[in-house]
Amino acid sequence: MNLNDIALTGLIVLMLAFAVYDEFVVNFLKGKTHLQIKLKRKHKIDALIFIILILIVVYNNITVYGSRLTTYLLLFTILVTIYIAYIRSPKLFFKNNGFFYANTFISYSRIKTMNLSEDGILVIGLENKKLYISVSQIDDLERIYKFLIENR
C-alpha cells in the first residue's frame, strides 16, 4: 500500500463518516427533532467535474498498469461521491433551541431577520451573516414559518 492508497483510504473514510453523521447522527443531536425539511441539492456540477477527474485518473492508472487497489479505491470514491451529491438530500432539522443547517447548529436567539425572496428562498439573517435556505417543496416554507412562529 503506497501513499496514494493511504490518502484515498483516508478520503473514503472521511466521506463515509460525513455521510453517516449527516444521515443518522445529526437527527439525534440537541434534543428531539420537531420538524425535518428536505432542501434542494447544490453543487451537482462540481460533483460531476470531480467524478470526471477521478475517471481520468482511473483511466491513467489502468493504462500504466497501476495498482488494482488504487483503481478500486478510486472507483469506490466515485460511488461515495455519487451518494453524497446525487442520492442523499440535504436536510434542515428544527430542534427545541435551534436548527441544524449544513451540519451547523444555529440557535434561534441568533436570528435577527427573516425574509422570503421572490423565487422561494428563505433568507435568515444572523448577527453577521445570511443563510439562504432553498427548500425542495415550496409548501415547506409555510411549515417552517408556522414552526418558527409557534416555537420561537
From Swiss-Prot:
Cellular component GO terms, alphabetical: plasma membrane
Superkingdom of origin: Bacteria
Membrane topology label: Multi-pass membrane protein
Sorted UniProt keywords: Cell inner membrane, Cell membrane, Membrane, Transmembrane, Transmembrane helix
Positions of transmembrane segments: 6-26, 45-65, 67-87
InterPro entries per record: DUF986
Cellular compartment(s): Cell inner membrane
Protein name: UPF0266 membrane protein plu2700
Similarity-based family: Belongs to the UPF0266 family.
